[in-house]
């Protein structure tokens, strides 16, 4: 049996897709097989028609949503549906809405198109929408697909690139039997209905060569217990947060570079906490880079797998009461892992890394770096010795989070 990959199929260029978006046409956007592995019908919100909504409802069969930028959502007073988002991919739903005027029940194709046009109208205010309703707005991450490789961000990015309001419409594509359509079926769907199709990875690549969300502020010499490094200070243009890159030797674009992307862990990295293996992994990575003679360690300010220091300490207390690290996060209302690797990928690319040998036990990090012009040629495990304080933690990472320990 021959397994077809994304490279087997013919996709349209982003320029052609943007051209269709600008003309008010529907396109198909697919994501990676390691993520949702789905295709969505996508169009610009300000170009929506009742016919387009009817097409999505009849042929897409998924949930019709209206992705918008955070700025637009704030202008319209669109509050998040829940305070703590536990959805597996953290799709940022707001409270559902209908247009305040010009609709009846709110569910017809005409009514939903009217609501979406109100969302896209730059003159609309919170008074122009009624809550709850039959259209589901989604908040896109600032920075779009360069921050989060999701359909929400792709829809808003494509609308903006087409010179339109930062608002879109999307609907998942399902089979007749209600199961998700995958890439081979999406290609047949595309052919049947004459639609253009692109991948989120190609959109990331398109934006990456035209935009940059990190900027280098300073480089200093950094002597360490593991030899001399050059310390690069980067600032995120999205939130002003600073991240670091420790670089040893010369980066050669034509040779694989040994790379570690390490998320900050104050308790483990600084205080030597034995509740986790973060400090051990940090020092093991620096040691391996020193032995290699060339490599990069990117230090991301993402404490507690992204939930922050205070929440991590509260999670520790729940772990003392018998919960594991995943259960503790869930009890606090957080997913098991909130980290965002897009900025780390941009830092690596800015440093000149193209191919890399990845020091990680976490397969999700590999997925998080894909689509940014980086090619992983080898996953290099980091071995951590269990102790009585972190044995349960390491077993949870292996059994529930897929870490290769």
For each of these PLM feature ranges, what is it?
Residues 1-405:
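Catalytic domains of riboflavin
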């Amino acid at each position: 049996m021959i397994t077809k990959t994304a490279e087997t199929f013919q996709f349209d260029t982003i320029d052609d897709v943007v051209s269709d978006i600008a003309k008010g046409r529907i396109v198909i956007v697919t994501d990676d097989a390691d993520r949702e592995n789905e295709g969505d019908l996508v169009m610009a919100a300000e170009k929506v028609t009742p016919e387009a909504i009817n097409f999505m409802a009849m042929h897409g069969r998924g949930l019709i949503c209206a992705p918008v930028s955070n700025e637009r959502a704030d202008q319209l007073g669109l509050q998040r549906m829940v305070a703590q988002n536990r959805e597996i991919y953290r799709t940022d739903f707001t409270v559902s809405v209908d247009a305040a005027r010009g609709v009846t029940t709110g569910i017809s194709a005409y009514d939903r198109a009217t609501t979406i046009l109100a969302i896209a109208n730059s003159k609309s205010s919170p008074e122009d929408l009624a809550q709850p309703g039959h259209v589901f707005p989604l908040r896109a991450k600032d920075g779009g697909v360069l921050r989060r490789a999701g359909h929400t961000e792709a829809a808003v990015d494509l609308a903006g690139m087409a010179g339109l309001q930062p608002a879109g419409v999307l609907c998942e594509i399902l089979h007749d039997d209600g199961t998700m359509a995958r890439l081979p079926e999406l290609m047949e769907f595309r052919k049947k209905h004459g639609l253009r199709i692109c991948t989120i990875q190609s959109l990331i690549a398109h934006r990456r060569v035209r935009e940059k969300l990190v900027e280098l502020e300073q480089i200093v010499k950094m002597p360490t217990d593991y030899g001399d490094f050059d310390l690069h200070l980067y600032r995120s243009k999205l939130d002003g947060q600073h991240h670091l890159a420790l670089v040893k030797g010369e980066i050669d674009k034509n040779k694989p570079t040994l790379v570690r992307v390490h998320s900050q862990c104050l308790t483990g990295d600084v205080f030597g906490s034995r509740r986790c293996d973060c400090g051990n992994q940090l020092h093991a990575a620096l040691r391996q880079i020193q032995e290699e003679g060339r490599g990069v360690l990117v230090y991301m300010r993402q404490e507690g797998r992204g939930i922050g220091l205070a929440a991590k300490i509260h999670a520790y207390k729940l772990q003392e009461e018998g919960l594991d690290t995943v259960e503790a996060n869930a009890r606090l209302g957080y997913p098991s892992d909130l980290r965002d690797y897009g900025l780390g990928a941009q830092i690596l690319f800015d440093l000149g890394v193209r191919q890399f040998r990845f020091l990680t036990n976490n397969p999700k990090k590999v997925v998080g770096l894909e689509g940014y012009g980086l090619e992983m040629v080898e996953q290099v495990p980091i071995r951590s010795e269990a102790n009585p304080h972190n044995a349960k933690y390491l077993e949870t990472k292996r059994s529930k989070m897929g870490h290769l320990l």
